[in-house]
Amino acid sequence: SINYXNMSNHHMLSTFNLLPVGSNISTWWNFGSMLMTCLALQTITGFFLAIHYTANINLAFSSIMHITRDIPYGWIMQNLHAIGASMFFVCIYIHIARGIYYGSYLNKEVWLSGVILLTALMATAFFGYVLPWGQMSFWAATVITNLLTAIPYLGTMLTTWLWGGFSINDPTLTRFFALHFVLPFIIISMSSIHIILLHNEGSSNPLGTNSDID
């Protein structure tokens, strides 16, 4: 059996494993662990897709067709990655809604780290949406990045810098792919911090009682 007395002496181990939370929590508290499952799924499938993807405006769409048609189990990887992204957002919005309803925002450090995670996730999803370089990808890249031009003085310069030129082109796709590949590792790091902070402070519960009451 697990010796919890010994585990408490190893702070990092106990922080990751032991969550102070009341025994009255419901299904709504499952979505944090479901998000970790989504993150693992997206990282694994994304790695295998990145192996075969070509970040070139003339070849990107063809490389995705190649993945779905010619690569063994490529169609599963592609579909899991696409549907997994949608599930990621379903889970995170339910996770946030539960946090708002039960007052988890009072735990400021955990909440703010979660806000950073949501922002990073939205950025990652946007960059991933552009990668197939279909008609909607081109539209999204143009419209969303054009919002930067609304920034006074610096807007046009920032947009040109992000595009890598005076219009959406090959350099844009290359850097979007690089950002889409790097951001999940930042999300993994931030998730670890989010979990450590949560396990330090303790989770909320439906009755709002102390986390370590039982």
UniProtKB/Swiss-Prot annotation:
Family matches, as PROSITE patterns: CYTB_NTER (PS51002)
UniProt-listed Gene3D superfamilies: Cytochrome Bc1 Complex, Chain C
**Record has Repeat as a keyword:** no
Give the GO molecular function terms.
Answer: metal ion binding; ubiquinol-cytochrome-c reductase activity
Family affiliation = Belongs to the cytochrome b family.
The UniProt function text for this chain reads: Component of the ubiquinol-cytochrome c reductase complex (complex III or cytochrome b-c1 complex) that is part of the mitochondrial respiratory chain. The b-c1 complex mediates electron transfer from ubiquinol to cytochrome c. Contributes to the generation of a proton gradient across the mitochondrial membrane that is then used for ATP synthesis.
Misc. remarks from the entry: Heme 1 (or BL or b562) is low-potential and absorbs at about 562 nm, and heme 2 (or BH or b566) is high-potential and absorbs at about 566 nm.
User: How is this protein organized at the quaternary level?
Assistant: The cytochrome bc1 complex contains 3 respiratory subunits (MT-CYB, CYC1 and UQCRFS1), 2 core proteins (UQCRC1 and UQCRC2) and probably 6 low-molecular weight proteins.
Q: Which protein is depicted?
A: Cytochrome b
- Taxonomic path: Eukaryota, Metazoa, Chordata, Craniata, Vertebrata
